Regions:
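Gly/Pro-rich turn-and-neighbor structural signature
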Residues: 1-106, 208-209
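Structured mid-domain segments that build the active-site/substrate or prosthetic-cofactor binding neighborhood
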Residues: 86-92, 99-209
Length: 209
């Protein structure tokens, strides 16, 4: 998947605080048009055959939506086949979801989720602090609203996050088994995961604790 667009230094606005909304949108359009042209020249002339994604982080959302005076990127034809990857609020809660009108857009939808976060107003790192039941609730809601093309999760340092990462990937891979139609299965999943990883060291009674 080729990521499209451009972010500013240290995840800031591209042109800085002094630039207008229109200036930032026009600049992004120039960047994306150039990227698409390079993809045509170097990868495939048919852009529909090249998976592309635009991540809509919080500093990019204003450019995506625009305002009453400036058209945003969301209806720009150059992005028709590009997957729009939405982001939650950095703490595992959905912020925005596709509307009924644009749920079936050609490029589809993705979600960027967090198990680890470094930034304002507070960081949480190096420890598994996300309940699987919350992951189930939030990502099932995302799936039901049409976010089914790309799921990405920020795990930070991998070592403390093996369980939630495994759950996130299994939920995406086998949604019929673990998704919306299977509520209250996170305990069952945890037990299966423990058996897979450490089964030889625990008897059944200990696994149920």
């Amino acid at each position: 998947i080729i990521t499209m667009g451009m972010r500013g230094e240290r995840d800031s606005e591209i042109l800085g605080h002094s630039a207008t909304l229109k200036e930032n949108i026009d600049y992004l359009k120039e960047v994306i048009t150039t990227q698409n042209q390079l993809i045509k020249e170097c990868v495939n002339e048919d852009l529909d055959q090249v998976p592309r994604m635009l991540a809509l982080y919080k500093e990019v959302e204003a450019y995506f939506h625009g305002d009453e005076n400036t058209q945003g990127l969301k209806d720009w034809k150059e992005l028709d086949g590009v997957t729009f990857m939405l982001c939650e609020d950095n703490f595992g809660n959905m912020r925005t979801l596709p509307t009924k009108e644009n749920r079936d857009r050609k490029g589809g939808w993705g979600m960027y989720y967090h198990f680890d976060y470094h930034g304002d107003p507070v960081s949480y790192e190096w420890v598994n602090s996300t309940h699987l039941s919350k992951v189930w609730e939030q990502m099932c809601e995302a799936y039901d609203y049409g976010i089914r093309d790309i799921w990405v999760v920020n795990v930070g340092d991998l070592k403390p996050q093996e369980l939630p990462l495994s759950y996130f990937l299994d939920l995406a891979y086998d949604f019929d088994k673990w998704g919306t139609l299977s509520p209250n299965k996170t305990g069952e999943y945890t037990k299966e995961w423990i058996c897979t990883q450490f089964g030889a060291f625990f008897n059944e009674e200990e696994q149920d604790r």
